[in-house]
Design a protein with these regions (language model features):
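Conserved "landmark" site that anchors the functional core of diverse proteins
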Residues: 1-155
Length: 155
């Protein structure tokens, strides 16, 4: 319903601790979003980025390893260009959504893909001088030590 979509875009969500490669739960103050008349939805194809509403009316954004079908109501879909931002948002950070047209989404995607394709040209190897590395001891430079003089029983 339109009223639920308007409420959704006006709500400030918090990235929950619950999240993995399957999806990210979002928390917010107040009552859950109404799924009136939508809880009898047959299972259908799910897209990465779909925003499902749980039985309690809480949003859950589906990520790269989400299920392929589902029957929960969905209020929208996060565009592919924004999914990396959402997936990497630390727990406790505020998130908000806005509805955009298909044309706007396609323009954002085109710009996103252009930036990704230009990365190869812009990226340079990082060469660091160990003398100037203040965090050198933080690196695991060896994974174990053995003695060349030890017998197989001692090592």
């Amino acid at each position: 319903p339109r009223s639920q979509c308007e409420r959704f875009t006006k709500t400030t969500f918090i990235r929950s601790l619950r999240g993995n490669r399957m999806g990210v739960a979002l928390e917010f103050e107040g009552d859950g979003f109404s799924a009136e008349g939508q809880l009898n939805i047959l299972s259908e194809i799910i897209s990465v980025g779909d925003i499902q509403m749980t039985g309690e009316g809480r949003p859950f954004v589906l990520l790269q390893e989400c299920q392929t079908t589902g029957g929960y109501p969905r209020i929208g879909t996060v565009i592919p260009a924004d999914l990396p931002k959402l997936a990497q948002t630390p727990p406790g950070i505020e998130i908000s959504f806005q509805m955009i047209t298909l044309k706007e989404a396609l323009n954002v995607q085109k710009s996103f893909e252009k930036n990704i394709n230009e990365l190869r040209r812009r990226v340079r190897p990082l060469i660091r001088d160990p003398i100037t590395m203040t965090n050198l001891l933080a690196y695991q430079l060896i994974s174990g030590a053995i003695s060349a003089n030890a017998t197989s029983e001692e090592s």
